[in-house]
Structures are given as C-alpha cells and as structure tokens.
C-alpha cells in the first residue's frame, strides 16, 4: 500500500513534459527581405534577423516547423523596440508573426528597448507541418532573434544572458562544450 502512495506522490509532484519548439530566426528556410545581423552576438550570443527596408516593408521571412502534438501553445518572440531607449512613443520596427497564413493579434517590436521575450498569446498548432512567417510592417529595422512555442502556457523563457545561453543550448540539443576538431594553422570558411 505504501508503494502506491509513493508512486502517486511522484506522479503528482512531477508535471507532465511540455512540448517545446524553439526556432532561431536566423535558421529560417527563407529570409525574404530580412537580413542577418550579428552586431549583438557578444551581448546575446546569437545573431538575429533585421528588416532593413529604408521605410519600405521587406518581403516576409518564412520557415516550416514540425509539431508532434497539436494543440494549444503559448508563443514568445524575442525582440526589442530599438527606439525606446530614447523615450520615443512610436515603434518603427514593428512586425507580425503569421502562423499558417494568419497573423497573431500581437504586433511585435513594440514593448521594451532591451532584448526580451514578447508574449504573443496562445494559439492552436496542428500536428505536422506549420508555416511560420515574419511580416515587416514598416521597413524600419524590425528585429527578431527567436520564436518559442510551448504547451506549458505559464512558462516564461529566460532573458538573462547566461540563463538564455543554457536555455538555447538545451532547446537546440547542443552540447555544453563544442567538439574539439583539432589544431589548425589556417581555416578557410565559405
């Protein structure tokens, strides 16, 4: 009898595993008119996509995510409002996130000057392939670092650099230390 209580206690104590999908914006299949910007890698540990259209909205960036368990997910988009540091009220770097052709109700790039996870609300993802797009609204430097979908609706991804690095590594299944490829005098990339 005591064994059953112990098993029940274990089941109640550990929440069910959430379904998480972490998408680096720079890994989109098609960048459209968005460009890869790596100027903040020292601060963030990752490059991001930038919609630099000189006032003309750029072509959508797009990718496909594969969802094992369809259902309700919360969406988080890592972004920033680059003019908030000057106390500006307008947010020129606004963009939308489209899922399977439908824009979320939230406009991104409108909240804070520093990089952060902006809440996109809850959505329903279907099992299988789902198309994700970034739609620039202004052509004035919208910024997207990553998108995080989670079935743990109350979960907030970390913002601190060290915590985010560990989180990103875990979500992408990367090792803690890079594989040692040996010593070389010259490396040619490209």
Put a short name on every predicted segment:
Residues 2-8:
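Sec-dependent signal peptide recognition
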Residues 18-173:
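Extracytoplasmic
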Residues 13-15:
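N-terminal signal peptide c-region/cleavage motif recognized by signal peptidases
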Residues 178-190:
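Beta1/beta-strand and adjacent pyrophosphate-binding region of the FAD-binding site
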Residues 11, 137, 175-177:
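Short, flexible, glycine/charge-rich loop motifs used to bind or transfer phosphoryl groups or to couple energy/partner
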């Amino acid at each position: 009898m005591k064994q059953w209580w112990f098993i029940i206690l274990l089941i109640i104590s550990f929440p069910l595993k959430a379904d998480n999908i972490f998408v680096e914006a720079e890994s989109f299949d098609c960048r459209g008119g968005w460009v890869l910007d790596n100027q903040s890698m020292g601060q963030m540990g990752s490059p991001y996509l930038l919609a630099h259209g000189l006032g003309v909205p750029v072509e959508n960036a797009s990718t496909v995510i594969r969802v094992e368990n369809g259902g309700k997910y919360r969406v988080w988009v890592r972004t920033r409002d680059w003019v908030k540091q000057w106390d500006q009220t307008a947010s020129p770097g606004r963009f939308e996130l489209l899922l399977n052709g439908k824009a979320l109700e939230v406009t991104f790039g409108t909240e804070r000057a520093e990089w952060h996870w902006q809440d996109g609300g809850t959505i329903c993802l279907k099992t299988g392939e789902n198309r994700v797009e970034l739609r620039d609204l202004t052509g004035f430097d919208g910024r997207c670092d990553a998108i995080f979908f989670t079935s743990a609706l109350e979960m907030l991804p970390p913002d601190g650099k060290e915590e985010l690095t560990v989180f990103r590594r875990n979500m992408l299944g990367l090792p803690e230390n890079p594989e040692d490829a040996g010593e070389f005098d010259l490396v040619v990339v490209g």
